[in-house]
Swiss-Prot record:
The keyword Iron does not apply. This is Methyltransferase srdJ. A motif (Required for methyltransferase activity) lies at residues 140-146. It is an enzyme of class 2 (transferase). Residues 1-32 are annotated as: Disordered. The lineage of its organism: Eukaryota, Fungi, Dikarya, Ascomycota, Pezizomycotina. Keywords: Methyltransferase, S-adenosyl-L-methionine, Transferase. Residues 9-21 have a biased composition (Low complexity). It comes from the Eukaryota. The keyword Transferase applies. Belongs to the methyltransferase superfamily. InterPro entries: Lys/N-term_MeTrsfase_sf, SAM-dependent_MTases_sf. SUPFAM superfamilies: S-adenosyl-L-methionine-dependent methyltransferases (SSF53335).
Length: 233
């Protein structure tokens, strides 16, 4: 179980994509193509459950203060890049009934629907196959305004396609948020949302230490971000 520490700064960090291998063990292997649909299709052919960075049971307490501020159980929640996580199940268990789950890969849709059916005996949440960098092209999303958007390392995967892809995702979320809506994002990067072009005011609301194999290993954190939309122009 990870210990969660609140934090107001982004200092004192390293991230998985910048960690070098130990001396004598060779260079770090290349990163997978996390931004490619083909990668996720191949992965989800065999994977049925996986939690990126932190378990949903760790993420939910970080969301609690924001869930309590939502207008009611029918508040609109957008869950981007749900993959094979069970976060949407935990949100429904919490009592929310208007949850839209979006993923790039159709196999994730099958996994998500099956998981919900197994947990509740029915499927009431919405599942949409879509590119999170092009939300405006999805009528089911662009016609709605969401009170809460959540992602767990989806922006990290999209960042493999470059900063413009992350900005496109952020702009789509900005357009999709209700006036009082917020975006909560978990990332391994202390600099994921540093772009001055980002249409959000950004705050780190928690640092989550990663597990260490040895006591002498460096401290590595994951970051939970609160992104509040800047005024729409």
């Amino acid at each position: 179980m990870f210990q969660v520490q609140t934090a107001g700064t982004r200092t004192g960090t390293s991230s998985p994509d910048t960690t070098t291998s130990e001396a004598g063990l060779g260079s770090t292997p290349p990163m997978p193509d996390f931004d490619k649909q083909s990668y996720w299709h191949q992965r989800f052919e065999s994977e049925t459950a996986f939690e990126w960075l932190i378990p949903s049971s760790t993420f939910m307490p970080l969301l609690e203060a924001f869930l309590n501020k939502l207008p009611g159980s029918d508040a609109r929640i957008l869950h981007l890049g749900f993959g094979t996580s069970d976060l949407q199940v935990q949100l429904r268990t919490r009592g929310f009934v208007n949850i839209t789950n979006v993923d790039y890969e159709p196999l994730a849709i099958e996994r998500g629907r099956h998981l919900e059916m197994t947990a509740f005996g029915d499927v009431t949440m919405q599942y949409i196959t879509a590119d999170a960098t092009n939300l405006a092209s999805v009528p089911e999303i662009s016609s709605q305004k969401y009170h809460l958007v959540v992602d767990k390392s989806t922006a990290d995967a999209i960042s493999c396609a470059g900063d413009d892809a992350v900005l496109a995702m952020a702009q789509g979320i900005h357009r999709s948020l209700a006036d009082d809506g917020v975006w909560i994002s978990v990332s391994y990067s202390a600099f994921r949302y540093d772009s001055p072009q980002l249409p959000f005011d950004v705050e780190v609301i928690a640092r989550i230490p990663t597990a260490k194999a040895r006591a002498t290993d460096p401290d590595i954190y994951h970051y939970c971000y609160l992104l509040r939309p800047k005024p729409k122009v």
